[in-house]
Amino acid sequence: MLKGKTVVLGVTGSIAAYKIANLASMLVKMHAQVHVLMTKNATNFINPITFETLTSTKCLVDTFDRNFQYSVEHVALAKQADVVLIAPASANVIGKIAGGIADDMLTTTVMACKCKKIIAPAMNTNMYENPIVQDNLEKLRHYGYEIIAPAVGYLACKDVGAGKLPSEEVLLEYILREIRFEKDLEGKKVLVTAGPTVEAIDPVRFISNRSTGKMGYALARVAMQRGAQVTLVSGPVSLEPPPFVDVVPVESAEDMFQAVTSRMAEQDIIIKAAAVADYTPATVADNKIKKTDGEAAIALTRTKDILGYLGEHRTEKQILCGFSMETENMLENSRKKLDKKHLDLVVANNLKVEGAGFGVDTNVVTLITREGARELPKMTKEEVAGAILDTLVE
């Protein structure tokens, strides 16, 4: 995933330094080249050998270490780096960088870098909220540094407040957004729908489907990592929303219709991956419907055709993609959908194929355009998302 990319991790003196060992391991598993720089204070919290074991590269602490290859190491690393993350970043190191002080391997490397630099402060709440620290962070923002807001939680000092280093998964997302993909969607607005809809019968019961939202969430995440400004209109799911994405939660098909159509005019690309109910109860009972000995019937009415509406009202420059979930005649039905709803692409799923459809992390799809059909092998849903976006931007 990150083969050929170089990530420099700067670790300062903080109890949260242990998290960066896990982050380094995660990056190595993605085939990134990882280099770790530590301040001397950081070595009081975690041993450099830990990072050297995980990354298979020398962990640098002292600018004048005699055991180095003949090159000016801070400059050499600065030239290699695709992204630099300083985490946890102490108030001391933040102040040094903001003041232009370069007196150790970490600060000299940061000063020499021209790549994206990200800082994740971690400290006591009062220190973080100190006007001097806030001024330094604002100064760094002005110079193009990205600042990750600390999490709120229970701190090492036994206080509860802002200052906690975010999870490794959050830190990883900031790195991936910068270096995982070329930014071929930069400047584009992309709307993705995901998940099921829920159609109420009474206050207890509802009609829904098996969609988990995984495919739509993967599309939103990959589009964001490729530089798009992403809006994710999501039915009820148990997934963590992708970072840097504007999430619009909805429940019913009518909710989704309103959320999508009110935002469609400003979008460059619309991908409708949600499994929207075709029918909804004609009336919703105010109270729970009691069980009886006889049969029960529920009158259903058609929901609004969101994709049909989008196809009829799209602009000439907009790109529109829909999904087709089929158990038979997949290609024939999907081609009809492509034509009838004025789409640029239909992503066809055969739900009878193992490893495809709802609730799994893989998918097997066929991409259908006006030029023809292309069947993809079984792939992760993020890989499928990449293939879909590749097709849409060709």
Residue ranges of predicted features:
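A cross-family phosphate/adenosyl-ligand binding-site feature
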Residues: 1-118, 124-213, 217-394
